Amino acid sequence: MLEFPQSGERFEGVENFREWRRQYPAALKFHNRRITHRDDLVVVENLISYDGQPWTFIVNVMEFRDDRVAHERIYIMDGWEAAEWREPWRSATRADPPFPEP
């Protein structure tokens, strides 16, 4: 099962998932930032570019059952500039490296 909580969509069954991926109308480029794995739960933090456009943040939350993805939720969001008022408490070290070229 694949879900997009932000749009309310759900895709059930491997064939629906495969066909959705096959029919996707844009060229996608991914840049993996981090993978966190605990027991049967994996969280993947990526950047995604659609048709060479600027990067967008994407988080995949996957639950595994018997070495297969049983349930996946995908969250997609734009980044934003840090608020200036937080600067006095912010570390000089970035949380993540700058974006690569899409």
Task: Explain the meaning of each model-derived region.
Residues 1-102:
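C-terminal and inter-domain tail/linker signature
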